[in-house]
Amino acid sequence: IHSGDESKRAYNNATVRDDEMKNGMDRITGDYNDFWAGRDYLNDMEPMKAALLMSHGFNDWNVMPEHSYRIYEAAKAQGLPCQIYYHQSGHGGPPPMTLMNRWFTHYLHGVENGVENDSRAWIVRENDSKEKPTPYEDFPNPEASDITLHLNSGAPAKGGLTTEYAKNKGNEKFVDNKFFK
């Protein structure tokens, strides 16, 4: 919805967003329901036997990156070979051809090329080309550490995030507008 091929957006908005999603989601409570369970690939992981090369956009309005990460983690837990590639765009977008070529040459054609020893995570950093992702041992990066972020006020424009706690934040209000149109 509102990403991917622009020539398909009107149809996707009308069919998926304004019909399927509007009627299937639980707008009152926001609870996970049968509609969402039926769309959750994680529920169908058990019979999977294939190597997984997962690709996802950090700026996907439709499927949160957390969802691809959960599938990636489930594949690892099942002992499947897997790598994950994250880019800075929205919904859709394949990994670089060189990465796909190495992956599929090995896992589809059995060519010994060492791809199973490559980094498990490939991240396109801010302002970098999709063809030049930064390799990491895994995702999340094992060398990363947690930090606490605090909200700053900023209505009616936008607030911000800081590592310092602001003492005089004031009060702000958020209105969740459930109407799509």
Predicted regions and their residues:
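Generic beta-strand/beta-sheet core signal
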Residues: 55-57, 85-87, 126, 152
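Structured segments of extracytoplasmic/periplasmic soluble domains
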Residues: 35, 39, 51, 71-74, ...
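C-terminal, loop-rich substrate-recognition/catalytic regions characterized by aromatic stacking residues
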Residues: 94-181
